């Protein structure tokens, strides 16, 4: 069966343009791929257009808007996720502006779709007591418990995203003074984060126990699951939830609803509360702009009150390619790496 124009362009976009011309990371391409799996599913279920019939002419501004609404109304995606999907679609249609300029008017109409305003939620973070309680839960008499303690404490100490922890290798750690760790962030951007000596002591023991100081292990995953494979994001999230549930039994007031990103938020808040400059916090977190980091300053109501009280002046008196055929497009997308 002859492939449709949509299938050809999508294949080239994902397998050639994004990795080769744009140089995007594997994780970003994976997110784009998921967007198109969802879009194809929507077109099949809601527009009755089978994947082997889906053509460029079927992709209109109206259908894109309907897809975005479907994500929220039927798949219960957040506004942030909706906007991520729209960004992926926008990237594809910017690509098509040059590949298929004869449809430029349609592409520009799609590109005119605005991101939906997202109401910012309060930052969810643990207090210092909460972090201490959480990190008391791994059983250090077991190899798994020791691994989990090092992994979660490193995620907190380095304010690392879960994918950044997954991508760590022993070669990224400097075990001589000054102790540092190299973290590869979004867009493959590296940053160097200082390590504290107490953290390094635990880390060295872990590396020795798991034979990760040997030269052949330099580029092996720093943390592996029970099958000796690289962790998934969900795998680490499950580990965190196990210990969070155990900690809640001891003191539920200290352990709010958590995700791996909560550890990053917690470290940022603790640095802010300790008086660390936002510019330094920005660099540790790997934010491009200090404006992104300011969310933590806005979130700390206790610090806001203290600042207001300290500045108070008493003015009132005292009293007061890879793809071949349309039928396999969904399979190709799901298996594309």
Model-derived segments and spans:
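Conserved catalytic core of the tyrosine transesterase superfamily
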Residues: 1-337
């Amino acid at each position: 069966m002859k492939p449709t124009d949509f299938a050809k362009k999508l294949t080239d976009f994902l397998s050639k343009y994004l990795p080769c011309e744009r140089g995007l990371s594997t994780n970003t391409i994976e997110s784009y791929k998921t967007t198109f799996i969802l879009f194809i599913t929507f077109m099949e279920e809601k527009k009755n257009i089978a994947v082997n019939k889906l053509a460029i002419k079927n992709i209109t501004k109206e259908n894109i808007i309907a897809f975005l609404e479907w994500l929220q109304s039927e798949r219960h995606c957040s506004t942030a996720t909706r906007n991520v999907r729209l960004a992926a679609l926008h990237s594809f249609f910017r690509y098509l502006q040059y590949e298929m300029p004869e449809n430029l008017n349609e592409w520009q109409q799609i590109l005119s779709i605005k991101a939906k305003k997202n109401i910012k939620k309060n930052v969810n973070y643990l207090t210092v007591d909460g972090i201490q309680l959480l990190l008391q839960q791994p059983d250090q008499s077991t190899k798994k418990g020791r691994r989990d303690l090092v992994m979660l404490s490193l995620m907190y100490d380095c304010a690392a995203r879960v994918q950044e922890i997954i991508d760590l290798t022993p070669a990224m750690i400097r075990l001589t003074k000054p102790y540092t760790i190299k973290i590869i962030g979004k867009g493959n951007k590296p940053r160097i984060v200082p390590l504290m000596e107490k953290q390094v002591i635990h880390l060295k023991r872990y590396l020795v126990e798991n034979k990760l100081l040997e030269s052949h292990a330099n580029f092996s995953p720093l943390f592996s699951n029970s099958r000796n494979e690289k962790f998934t994001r969900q795998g680490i999230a499950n580990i965190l939830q196990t210990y969070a549930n155990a900690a809640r039994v001891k003191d539920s007031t200290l352990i709010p609803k958590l995700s791996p990103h909560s550890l990053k938020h917690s470290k940022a808040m603790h640095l802010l509360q300790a008086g660390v400059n936002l510019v330094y916090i920005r660099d540790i977190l790997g934010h491009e702009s200090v404006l992104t980091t300011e969310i933590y300053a806005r979130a700390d109501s206790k610090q806001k009150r203290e600042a207001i009280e300290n500045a108070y002046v008493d003015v009132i008196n005292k009293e007061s390619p890879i793809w071949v055929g349309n039928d396999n497009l969904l399979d190709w997308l799901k298996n594309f790496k």
